[in-house]
Design a protein with these regions (language model features):
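Residues in the short beta-alpha loop(s) of Rossmann-like NAD(P)-binding domains
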Residues: 50, 119, 143
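Mid-domain Rossmann-like dinucleotide-binding core that forms the NAD(H)/NADP(H) cofactor-binding site
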Residues: 1-71
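C-terminal hydrophobic helical "lid"/dimerization subdomain
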Residues: 101-105, 145-201
């Protein structure tokens, strides 16, 4: 289900072979969006504030990473990765005003930008850049039946290493510890699975 959310967003942005894509946010949804974009033939980079998350993202075949530790470093990295042109597609997978602005700044003229991250704060951003750059901005939530069907084919074709997404397995009796660990996630946890095999029926 999380993969379908990411895949639907990538499809909304019409990611295709030859596109240069930047995913902003290397959590579960962001990493899955990167996998989906790679499967569609794009060159994919992923950005995050956490070096640990970026190291983990490399295991999923992204073409490069960009540490977003300051606006200056982010902008410089985008310019270097795109020869100053910007990315064809930017994917917002965090839901913060700052990462929304990152996606606007990193997108090329006439580029596509899709919002997957769910925000809780009102946005305060430079909307004139959307006009000046003639950006195409897409919202995305959940998924469609066709997304599930296409993903089944993708998994069967071996283009989606989903087994790597499950980074931690806890016995059910350790559920409280699992939630505490995830709340303090240093960046090396993506999806957590509970093992119910030890429960007496």
């Amino acid at each position: 289900e999380p993969f379908c959310i990411s895949y639907h967003g990538v499809s909304r942005a019409n990611v295709k072979e030859g596109d240069k894509v930047l995913v902003v946010g290397a959590g579960t949804i962001g990493v899955l969006a990167a996998i989906a974009a790679k499967a569609k033939g794009a060159t994919v980079y992923i950005s995050d504030v956490s070096e640990g998350k970026l190291e983990m993202a490399k295991e999923f075949g992204v073409d490069g990473t960009l540490l977003n530790d300051s606006p200056e470093h982010f902008d410089k990295g985008v310019a270097e990765l795109t020869e100053g042109n910007g990315f064809d597609v930017t994917i917002e997978a965090v839901g913060l005003p700052s990462t929304f602005q990152n996606c606007i700044d990193a997108c090329c003229f006439g580029g596509r930008m899709v919002l997957i991250g769910v925000g809780k704060k009102n946005l305060d951003f430079n909307f004139t850049l959307i006009q000046k750059k003639e950006l195409n901005v897409f919202g995305s939530r959940n998924a469609l039946k066709k997304d599930f069907l296409e993903l089944i084919d993708l998994v069967h074709a071996g283009k989606a290493p989903l087994e790597k997404i499950i980074t931690n397995v806890y016995p059910f009796e350790d559920a409280a510890k699992a939630f505490a660990d995830f709340a303090n996630n240093p960046g090396d946890m993506l999806k957590v699975v509970f093992d119910f095999s030890g429960i007496n029926k």
